[in-house]
């Protein structure tokens, strides 16, 4: 029986033997291929656009807030992030109430937000940098002017973000004040300029207050060109609700406060305004008292881009100028990622055209604020627009007479 089984398996064994005897042709691989030479290719990995630490437009990072005594590379224009939201307010100790059984009552305060709609602007600086990742200083030549401001006279750097606490808004603003003070006191790279200029990436619009305090320290009161859908000159007793002085400092009252502190001139102007007011007459009276004129959003249809530019230039002529751009000046179709969106705004092209038309003004500071990336669409429409607005603001600074 065993012999029969062996005889039956014998053909199969012959097959296995034959398989082992098969000789395959030599594999054509690395041994027969010419290796591409790796030397003398001039490969440069120092300017990778999508690698390394993210900075605005892939600019060099400088630790502008380095401790005293540590050397910092001189620069002329600095990008400074302000990751700040006036939300989750914690009241001052003397404002805390107690109920009849001694339990702390915080609901009245904790339910109050400093932003009037959606929070999230603290992530604006990182979002704007993300939107600028396609920009490279060596390849930023304007199709309109044939110029590249990144390779002009100014050394432009990204200082990163100011380290701001997210637990105490009052302390965070003091930190931002200090950050602006340090950065603006750094030595310039150009011998023709004594003070670096700062472009702030917000953050909610309250951050502009720290920037204006900084510009006042070096240049005195400035005219403000304020691109926004809201006035932002509201009396703190109106928008803050009269709850406390602490609650009255927010992104809708900062221009009122700046006026009270003597930081801005009575030659300032809004552009793109269209949001409802809290008081039909009182808000406008207070706005005039704070030194502002208004270009309403729909007036761009009446006067055109050239007409808007002319009004802005006429209003701030022969003064030092700070430009503040709330991204909600754009229609939500072009910038959905913002805290308090208002329909009926400008297009991205209209805003950029107006900004570029301000060339020749003495711009000494600027910001882009209220970008809340969490509400953006998959195409990142808002952060792309904000990044390009920053580019235009840098251009105005480079071409500024001082």
Regions found by a protein language model. Give the residues of each.
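Conserved alpha-helical scaffold segments that buttress catalytic/binding sites
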Residues: 20-106, 110-402
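Fungal secretory targeting signals
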Residues: 1-20
